[in-house]
Regions:
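"…together with the soluble PPM/PP2C metallo-phosphatase catalytic core" -> "…together
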Residues: 1-183
Length: 183
């Protein structure tokens, strides 16, 4: 259900996001490193964010686990940082700072990579990994839909791994992101 809610929400919100982006002149203009030749709307990520968040909120309405609250808060901080950066490019330190703040929220909710290492090392690895993955996906964002497509492929594998390991919360969150990316 979470997959289809995210997919549908994103499909419904994308045309609105596209119109709003052009109306607000919230577009990426062609440049030398860009593949597109015409202005591209910059609110597609907001539609994907909305699809995933709405799906998670509907599925976990009422009494969500603290982990879900942490993921929602962190995702919101990172998404807002990206949205602000799309509107008015932020200096690298500010963009990293917003991402770092979002990922600190995850860590504060106890979300971390669990390795046979001291806990502080696990948290440091978690922060570095999340910053690295986020910026790697951000670097792919020079062609319309490329980031969403690659994110959908990787999220599919996360979903499969979570299901085979009975990690149903991770599976639900991955299904929400997958549905949103495919929308």
């Amino acid at each position: 259900a979470v997959f289809f809610i995210a997919l549908t929400t994103t499909l419904v919100s994308l045309p609105w996001a596209r119109r709003a982006a052009f109306a607000l002149d919230f577009v990426d203009v062609p440049a030398q490193r860009k593949v597109h030749r015409t202005p591209m709307p910059l609110l597609g990520g907001a539609a994907i964010f909305l699809g995933a968040i709405v799906a998670v909120l509907i599925i976990y309405r009422g009494d969500p686990e603290p982990t879900v609250i942490g993921v929602l808060l962190a995702t919101t901080v990172v998404a807002l940082t990206g949205l602000i950066d799309d509107y008015r490019p932020l200096p690298a330190w500010a963009k990293l700072g917003g991402q770092f703040l979002g990922f600190l929220i995850l860590v504060a909710f106890g979300i971390r990579v669990r390795l046979p290492l001291p806990e502080p090392v696990d948290y440091a690895i978690t922060l570095l990994w999340l910053l690295g993955i986020t910026n790697a996906v951000n670097f792919l964002d020079n062609m319309d839909g490329l980031s969403a497509g690659i994110s959908a492929v990787t999220t599919s594998f996360i979903l499969l791994l979570a299901l085979t390991n009975n990690q149903f919360l991770v599976a639900a969150l991955a299904a929400a992101l997958l549905g949103a990316c495919l929308g």
